Every structure is written in C-alpha cells, then in structure tokens.
UniProtKB/Swiss-Prot annotation:
Source organism: Toxoplasma gondii
Biased composition (Basic residues): 214-228, 892-901
Protein name: Rhoptry neck protein 4
Glycosylated residues (UniProt): N81, N390, N780, N925
Main localization (coarse): secreted
Glycoprotein keyword on record: yes
GO cellular component: membrane; symbiont-containing vacuole membrane
Compositional bias of kind Low complexity: 902-914
Sequence segments annotated as region (Disordered): 24-300, 882-984
Swiss-Prot/TrEMBL keywords: Glycoprotein, Membrane, Repeat, Secreted, Signal
Sequence repeats: 129-172, 258-301
Length: 984
C-alpha cells in the first residue's frame, strides 16, 4: 500500500522520517537529544533547558486480547504540557525502522481489527518526539512449561517470548529459527513469525534492505486468531485483567542496562541434579539458554559414569585421596639415574681397591657371600661393603692390634665372640688364622668349643620383595608423593649390616676415646718428627672432624692453665705460637685428607670450624654422664659447662682466635689469576699464594717476606705467616723418609719454612717492626715453642691419644694438672724489638736492575737479583759481595758515561752515608761490598760514573741525595777475579 500524501512541508517531513529513520526539523534546527540506557543520565541541551514545551517521552506497549487495541502512552513530560501518542498499526505495508535516533516508536499489530493506515503526525509532534532505542533481544528458557529455548524481544519494558530450536553451534541459525516458527504455526502453537525474524506479537524488527510482507503477516494473524493455544488464552486473559499503565524504567534484572549491540555470552554447564548430559549455556541480555550437547569421547572420563558413581554413594562420602585411575606396575618405578651414578662411582673405587689390595677385596666378597662379578645395587649394599671392608681391616689388617686395645675390655668379648659364632661357617678358616696371627690376644675369643648362639637367623628379604613385585598396586596420590623406587633384590645369604662387627667396634671406641670415623692407617715417620717419646706412627687417614674435636679440648686446657686476671696473650710467645700453629695444622691436615680423596674439597675450612667450636665451647662440651661407665654427676657437669662457656668468651680466647684465623688465612689463600681464583690444595701452596712469589729461588722468597712485613702494619698477619712456615717445616720433616704413597704426597705438600726464615734473616734485618713478630719469625727464638705445639697437636693423630687416655682426662675437666707440652707450660716473655733499619747504602745489599742494550736502566719494578740471573744481563762493572736481597729501599747501581776523571774516594762514600736517615756505616765498610779493580787510564778509554741514587722511604719522595764518583775504566769489560767470583 502506498502512502497518499501531498509533498508539502509537513508531508515531506513525515516521508523523510519514515524512510531515513531520523528526525528532520525545518526551522529552527534543533539537535536531536541522544538516547542513553538510563534517561536520568541524558544531558539536556541549552534549548531544552530554556524551552518549557520540550517533552521527553518513552513508548509503552500493552498487548490486548482479541477485539482490543494496543495503546501507546508517553511518560510524564518534563514541562507543563502533556501529550499522549497513540498509534494503531494494522496491515500497513510500510514499516518504520526502529533504529537509534528515530522519532517514532515501532508499530504494534492489533488483533481482530482491519488494517488501516497509520495517522500522520503534525509537524510539532514530530519535532518534539525524542528518538527511541531499538528493541533489545535476548534469549530465555521457559522452565515452567518445559518448552524449548526462546527468543526474547524487548521494547518499552514489555517482553515477547518466541520459542526457538536448539542450535548446532553457539548462536542459533536464522533459517532454522524461521522454519521452527513456521512449523509452530502449522501445529497450532498460536505464534507466527515473519521473514524478517520478528513475531506478530511483538514489535517488528525488519532486516536491513528487505521490506516486510504484510500479506503473509495478516494471514498468520488470522490463523492465530482462529486457532488460539492454551498458553495464548491464558496470556490474553491476564492482559485483559491488567489496566494499561505507563512504562516503568527498566531494571537491571530485566537486562535493560545491557547495550543493544552486546554479543551473547556462552559457557558450558553440567546438570548433575537431573542426570542429563552436558550442555551449552548461552547468555544474552541477562538470560541464559541451556542447549543439551552429547558427552565427549576424548581424554576426559565420561561424566555419566562419574555422576552415577556419585549418586550411588551419596550416603558414604568419598575420602580426599580417592583416585579413579589405577594401573598395574609389576616392577614399580625405578629411578635409574641414582643407581647408575652409584654403580659408576663404586666401580671406580673398586678398580683402585682391586689394583692395590686384591686379597683384601677377595676377603670382603667372601665375607659378604657375593659372587666375584657382583656390584652393589643400592646405597645399603654399598654401606655393607664399606663396613665389611673396615671389618676385615680391623680383624686382619695392620690396625687390628690397635683396635683390639682401643676397645674397652668389657666389650671385647661381646664383639669378637659374636663375630666368630656368626661367621665361622661362612668365612674360610684361613681368615680366623690370619686374625690370630695379626693379634694373638684375639685367639681366646675364637674358641670352637663354645656353642653357636641360638639366635634365629633373620630371613632375607628376597621372598618378600619378590611377592611384593608380583602384586600389582594402584598408584594413588601420585601428585603428592615421590616416585617409588624399586630396590633390586639382594644376593642370597647376604649378611645384614647389623651382623657386621665394625659398627659395634666404632661405637665402643668412640665412647672411650672420642669420635672415630675410619679405621686407622698407621704410617711410620722419620726419627726427626716431633712426636711423643716412643711413638713413631701417624694415622694419615684420621678424619678432620676427629682432629678438630681433639684439638679443641687441648686448646681449652692450655688457655685454662695460662688464664690470669690481667694476662695478655701477646706477653706469652709460647701461647702465641700454640694458637698460630693450630690454624695452620688443621688446614694442612684437611688438605692431606682431600689429597687422599677421603674428604670432599668443598667442605668448610678447618680453621673456621675450629674457631666456631672455641667460641661456643659450652655448646660442644661433653655429656653429663660417662658413656663407658654410665655414671653421672649433673651438678659437676653444670659447673664445668659454665666455666668452659666463660673461658670461650674470655679476652685470652679472643686473642687466640685472632692468631688462629691469621695462620688459617695464609694456609687457605687462593691463587688469583685476575679472572678467577683457584683454591690452595696444600699448605705450601697457600704460603706461596700469600707471598705471591714462586719458591724457585730463596732470594725472591726472602724479599717477598720483607715486602709482606711492610705491607701489613699489624703483627698478627706476620705472625700467621711465620707460624704457617714453621708448621709446614715440621710436617716436611716427618714425611721426608717416604715409604708409602701417602708419605710422598704429604712431603710435597709442605715447604721447609724454617730455612726460608733463616735465609730472610741473613741480611741481619729483623722481620717486621713489632717485638712479637720479630720473635715469632726468628726460628732461633721461637723454634722450641712451635716444636712443642706440633708435638701437642700430633698427639691427636698418633697412638698417644688412646694410650695416655687423654680424652677421659680432658673431658672430665677436673682440677688435675696435665703437663702435655713441657715447653709450653712456662710463660715465655717476648724479647724487646730490634730497630728495623733500612739502609740506603748502594754498596750494601742492593737491587740489581736490568740493563738495556742502549745503556738505560729499567724501571724500579723490574728488579733482578744476583742469585740465578745470567751474566749477560748483570752489570759487569759492579761486583756485589755477600748476601744480596733486592729491596725497594735500596740504591740503584748502573754504569753510565763518565762525567769526570776523578777517582772515587772514601769521602764520597761517607757523604752518601751522611745523607741517610739511619746510622751510617764507616767509610771503609761502605766500599767493602763493592770491589772495583782500578786500572791505568788509556787513550781512548770510556769513562764511567757510579751513581748512588738514594731515596729514603721515611723522607719526602721528592728529596734526593745524589753523589757522583767517576771511575777510570777501560772500554773493555773488566773481568771478575777468581776470589770475587768464589765469594759470589
């Protein structure tokens, strides 16, 4: 139907409004107000605030039953005027667009009324009508009637629900929606749809660019009128009973706050209550649409089985650790990396052991009942092998006699008798015969007449493990526990570790004499070694922790004897020697254990552990009872502990710790290459790294000692260096007669420090400025104290500790006096310091510089000393006699061109001596060390001058004393005399 209207001003305005969907105003142009979801948020324009006739209206649609009309009423106006717009659209072939910005509301069809054209509006009404928002569409579910999903369209606060079929995807297809709506009309559902996707009961929402078909819409309206459904009758009756009211503001629950263009949201849910399958949940405009979907067949379990299990066990709640998956694991879970690394390490150890001690390895295998090619499979078997190795060493080794005597007599019968009764049928008879040959005293416990103990032998775990391996077990709670490790089955008849006697021996010796980690390996030492009287062996495998435990008790006892109220450690050079020797001794011992691959190189430094034990002596004190006898005196123990704690915090102990640290730092000084630091592996290496000088020449070492003394002003640094040097010399003496591989290793790990100090003192210059450092660094004064300290500390690694029962005497902390080192008992006063002069005479111990081809001397940093340098780089005109030690404080001697023909005289030398700040030497002594052979002057002889450039370190560096003494020499080099060469 075409709209008949004259193209006048008002008619043209209406036509443009219907076609374009926008409000066209003539004069004056007024901007159209913007629509907002909330009308209270819409700002008013300037014109609307000034003009009282501006209205703000919204559409309200009431659906009436048949024979009724749908009315449209506006909201209350903002001004004084009221306007009510009513439009009845029935069968109009032109439908206005309901887009944002239009001034007309969407048409609503009227049931039971013949179609008639919509009334035209006046120009004023069209200008005052604000644009309305497009109807919103959402999806909802009618759970009450059990119908399918539906489409919900909303306009002006009224909702129209249209059933839609379940879609295959997330969003429904329009074709399926249209076909479903048409089928509902044919079945008498009372609801019809148009091709544009809208319904006849709700506002028309035509598709863009497609005009609606009014003829089909009328036919569907008539069919719905003729065949109403019960649902439509019920809704119609409800609408008749409700009077028409104005549209209320939309609430958040109705989805009015959602913007028109918001996309529907989709999620997945499971209806566990009704037992249905999983579903797809679509949400649009605040409503949810649930579409059933089939259960998945992927990696996830079937939800129906899980739901049925939960429904069947509702009465009994499931525990938290219930798992739904289990599998049979006959062999368990094996961590092959651990077993592989264990086998590789043990195989290397066994190779070395088999090469050095093949008979001992064979005895161990017989002891354990293993075949010749068997290797331990787990850590327990490795420990069994080590215990068996220690047992054979304790029974038939060189330490068998010592171990037998170290075990308390009341425990010997239990250990040796039980061992014989347990293994006399498993070990060959030759084993027990060898044990009796090494230690005849043990034969009394190897008596065949004694009946074997009726102790039932514990069966091996082979049967139990095999049964457990065949039974499949579910892997439950695999996320919270580590992987199960399947230990290989032990060999048949393997002796358990509890039956091996070595742990019992170790425990018995530790109770009586302190901790014992390994079986001793007694190595003979030379007669010049500073050991106790009658002792000639050292246990080279003694653990560092055992040595630290014993030395701690020794130092506490010595400080306790010398502790006074006002005494100072620096006043007793014997105690200073003891403390400085302790740090070097324990570090050197740790280096030796690491060289034998008995300890890990990454362990903490030994001197640091010793300091920590001494500072916290109260925490490391003995137990309140005697482990050997079981007797206890708690009151005495509490008193002793308080005294030891007080001694550990005393000033004397703090001073001792200072010197322990100084010598320990020297022993562990790493080598700094500039880019990396390499730790020292021996006491010899630590001393060389501290001096930063190779020990290829004693002259260089002597110079480095003096340089080190100048660099460090405090005496403890120099005391630590000298203490490490002297202790290293005593170690070298002990292992100089190398009879074993361990002795050879220890010999090369040390240096004869006493010889180095003597060579340094050959210049008749003391080392350092302090009286204490001069006394400690002089072997002629302090050698006796360092020898006593070494003798005291060596008792911890010799048989003297067990024979003299030192552990019981030191741990009891009684008032009984113990004289362990006679040379350390009396207080040794420190002699006064000697003046540490630095001569500036060029004719005494001078530095020798390298002479370039051009005759220039090199920089003072490139110093060459006399010992060991080739004659081609030595100054040939200068003959230096006596010990020469290069020193930065010495004068420089180099040949230059002559400046005068005046011969050298004693006055020049005396003038040079007077320029020095030290006591000058006589003139005749000034030239005593400088031998120059005068010769007759020749015609074309070169003239040389001997310059003495003296700069005293105690004076200003800019002040120089320069004396020239020309000498007559030939152009040929003066040959050195035989007598002078012999003196060099």
């Amino acid at each position: 139907m075409a709209i008949k209207n004259t193209l006048t001003g008002s008619g043209l305005l209406v036509l443009l409004t219907l076609a374009c969907g926008t409000t066209v105003q003539s004069s004056p142009p007024t901007p159209a107000p913007r629509m907002y979801p909330n009308m209270n948020e819409r700002p008013l324009s300037a014109e609307s605030r000034l003009t009282p006739g501006t209205y703000r209206s919204e559409l309200h649609i009431d659906l009436k039953s048949p024979q009724k009309t749908a009315s449209q009423s506006s909201l209350a106006p903002t001004g004084d005027n009221n306007s009510k717009v009513e439009s009845i659209i029935a069968g109009s072939d032109t439908t206005p667009r309901s887009a944002e910005g239009t001034s007309e509301s969407p048409p609503v069809p009227q049931l039971g009324t013949p179609p008639r054209p919509a009334p035209r509006r006046s120009k004023g009404e069209g200008e005052r009508q604000p644009p309305t928002a497009a109807p919103r569409t959402s999806r909802s579910v009618d759970t009450g009637s059990g119908s399918d999903a539906s489409t919900e369209q909303q306009a002006g606060g009224q909702k129209v629900v249209t059933p839609i079929p379940a879609s295959k995807g997330i969003y429904p297809s329009l074709d399926e929606l249209r076909r479903s709506q048409e089928s509902n009309v044919d079945a008498g559902s009372g609801t019809s749809t148009n091709e544009g996707g809208g319904t006849s009961e709700g506002p028309q929402v035509p598709q863009s660019g497609i005009p609606p078909r009014t003829g089909r819409r009328r036919a569907k309206a008539r069919n719905r009128k003729r065949h109403p459904t019960p649902a439509s009758r019920e809704s119609s009756s409800e609408d008749e009973n409700q009077p028409p009211t104005t549209a209320s503001r939309p609430s958040n629950g109705e989805g009015e706050s959602q913007p028109p263009t918001a996309a529907p949201r989709t999620s997945r849910s499971v209806d566990t209550g009704s037992g249905s399958d999983a579903s797809t949940e679509q949400q649009a405009g605040g409503q949810k649409v649930v579409t059933p979907i089939p259960a998945s067949k992927g990696i996830y379990p079937n939800l129906d089985e899980l739901r049925q299990t939960q429904e069947g066990e509702e009465s009994a709640p499931q525990p938290a650790d219930v798992t739904w998956f289990s599998m049979s694991v006959p062999m368990g879970v094996v961590d092959r990396r651990v077993s592989r690394a264990l086998k590789e390490q043990f195989f290397q150890f066994l190779q070395h052991l088999s090469a050095d001690y093949p008979k001992q390895v064979q005895t161990v295998y017989e002891f354990l009942g293993w075949v010749a090619d068997k290797l331990p499979e787990n850590e327990e078997e490795v420990q069994m092998f080590i215990d068996a190795l220690n047992t054979t060493e304790a029974m038939v080794g060189k330490a068998a006699r010592w171990i037998f005597k170290a075990i308390p007599e009341r425990e010997r019968e239990t250990i040796y008798s039980s061992f014989y009764q347990m293994f006399r049928d498993k070990l060959p008879k030759k084993f027990f015969e060898t044990a009796e040959g090494m230690n005849p005293d043990v034969g009394q416990y190897f008596s065949a007449e004694e009946p074997v103990a009726v102790t039932p032998e514990i069966p091996a775990k082979s049967e139990e493990d095999s049964e457990a391996a065949e039974t499949p077990t579910p892997l439950r709670r695999q996320a919270n526990v580590a992987a199960q490790v399947l230990h290989p089955l032990p060999a048949k008849g393997v002796t358990r570790r509890e039956w091996i006697p070595w742990p019992k021996m170790q425990n018995a010796i530790s109770k009586a004499h302190g901790p014992l980690t390994r079986v001793p390996e007694w190595t003979p030492v030379t007669g010049s070694c500073a050991l106790g009287d009658g002792y000639t062996d050292i246990d080279v495998t003694k653990a560092t922790t055992d040595v630290l435990f014993r030395i701690t008790l020794l130092i506490l006892q010595q400080i306790r004897r010398k502790k006074t109220e006002r005494g100072k450690l620096e006043d007793d050079q014997a105690l200073v020697a003891l403390c400085s020797a302790a740090g070097a001794f324990v570090d050197a011992w740790q280096h030796q254990q690491q060289a034998l691959i008995l300890e890990d190189p990454g362990t903490p430094k030994a001197h640091a552990q010793l300091i920590e034990r001494l500072r916290n002596a109260g925490k490391y004190f003995m137990k309140s009872y005697d482990e050997t006898t079981g007797e206890s005196d708690h009151q005495q123990w509490k008193k002793n502990k308080a005294e030891v704690s007080k001694l550990g915090k005393s000033a004397l102990m703090k001073s001792c710790v200072k010197y322990i640290k100084a010598s320990g730092d020297v022993a562990t000084r790493p080598f700094d290459s500039g880019t990396a630091k390499y730790p020292s592996r021996s006491l010899y290496g630590g001393i060389a790294n501290t001096l930063e000088t190779p020990f290829a020449d004693s002259e260089a070492v002597a110079k480095a000692v003096h340089d080190y003394a100048k660099e460090h002003k405090k005496p403890e640094k120099l005391v630590g260096l000298c203490g490490a040097l002297q202790i290293s010399g005593y170690f070298k003496k002990c292992f100089s007669d190398a009879g074993r591989l361990s002795s050879v290793s220890f010999f090369h790990q040390h240096v004869d420090g006493a010889s180095v100090l003597v060579r340094t003192l050959a210049r008749e210059r003391p080392i350092g400025r302090h009286a204490l450092s001069q006394a400690i660094c002089d072997p002629n004064i302090s050698a006796q104290y360092f020898e006593g300290a070494f003798r005291l500390f060596s008792s911890t690694v010799s048989q003297e500790w067990e024979k003299e029962n030192l552990f019981a005497q030191l741990a009891s902390w009684t008032g009984k006096e113990m004289v362990l080192a006679p040379s350390l008992e009396e207080q040794a006063a420190v002699p006064p310091a000697q003046p540490a002069y630095e001569t500036v005479y060029g004719d005494e111990e001078d530095r020798i510089y390298r002479i370039h081809v051009s005759g220039r001397h090199s920089s003072p940093q490139e110093v060459l000393y006399v010992g060991g340098i080739p004659s081609t780089v030595k100054p040939q005109q200068v003959h230096v006699l006596g010990p020469t030690v290069s020193d930065e404080s010495r004068r420089m001697i180099h040949p230059v061109r002559h400046r005068s023909r005046t011969a050298p005289s004693s006055e020049a030398a005396s003038t040079a001596a007077e320029s020095s700040d030290e006591d000058p030497l006589p003139a005749e002594n000034a030239t005593a060390f400088l031998g120059v052979t005068p010769q007759e002057e020749e015609s074309d002889a070169y003239k040389h001058t001997l310059d003495f450039d003296a700069v005293s370190p105690r004076k200003n560096k800019n002040k120089e004393n320069r004396i020239s003494a020309p000498l007559k020499q030939s152009d040929t080099l003066i040959e050195e005399s035989t007598s002078k060469t012999s003196e060099l």
